[in-house]
């Protein structure tokens, strides 16, 4: 989007010329190009084409108009496009600084590495560039699901902590989560689960490629976690908890006749989203009411450690003005930075199989694995095998293959071809065939099984075949977990998913 006008200042304010600024948006590098006379901005070009098509990318014209009208980089932004708007403002600030002859501090590009070396090199930051110091006992890096849980618990116990987040808001809430033998389970009359058997089953399902100590921690402490969250969500903010148990939490018995006899612990919890409340936002409100807050727009640059190898804190960077901040954490640093689905370098090199069969993703594009890289730079041991969570819902048009396609705007020059976040009916175990019309796997399986089976088929994709009785069949299949939305949502929900796929050209 481009446009011309004259946002004026005093004569001689600017060095006439055209300047370019960039900043990381939610899924791409946002670029702003501004032309200055000696007293005014005469032209602005905003390129957000790599952002989400219907959100950030669509906001380019309005953001350009705001920059032209404001005569500065301080604009209101576009509602619903917060991260893209902030990136545009940051890029515009760089243009203004250049036009005024000011030194522009170059930021540490957090998504480092390349197609041959996913890790890249730890940034070398000059001490003179560190202009702020924060002392705390505990530092939490990342205000997503893990980070906000940790922050809420720390706040409830009056601990001295800080929490930072590279974006301008808390990250998406994962509404479904699990716990063993909670108070809700006891109230529903559920018998205590065989914890030793569950530990063995989870290890078997992972082919033994797991740390059973971590699994055991979840088994033994998840009920306490659920109780703590319920105190906040239900008792404090009045958001009801939904517990899935009984027959609703199990596949039909006939499924085991010619299939794996899975275990079905009643572990599924979520909160009523019809209230409009997102758990992470309420957790933010909770810690704020206790006198804490999140240091937003603050990115991890590197971990620091002493001569004994102990982590003592981090160096962070403000994503607003690029100044560096040292956080000294006397008792420790908790990394809650998520994975690396938004980084094709890491995806292809660390998980080539999962990458090859993926068509569409419902991940955060800002999740580029920087916390993992920083930990490895500091000496952490990285699991030798990736553990992706794949859903069988990445609907794409006929003829589209699984895996990356080239992209001029996405980070790393690659993106997955699908544009629909999740086509929930895709999980239903209807007939699934390859491009030759051949059935190739048992469709009644956990989410990722059919996806991996497609790795051996043409294009690494398949077609799902069903008829007009899909809702009746979905009730009979009685799949569980979040796939139950197709069954429980009824005709309105299903038709909405179909209409979205038809409009997208995928169905």
Q: Predicted regions span which residues?
A:
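Glycine-rich FAD pyrophosphate-binding loop
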Residues: 155-174
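Active-site- and interface-proximal helix/loop "cap" or "latch" segments in soluble metabolic
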Residues: 9-109
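Glycine-rich active-site loop/strand segments that organize a redox cofactor
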Residues: 180-218
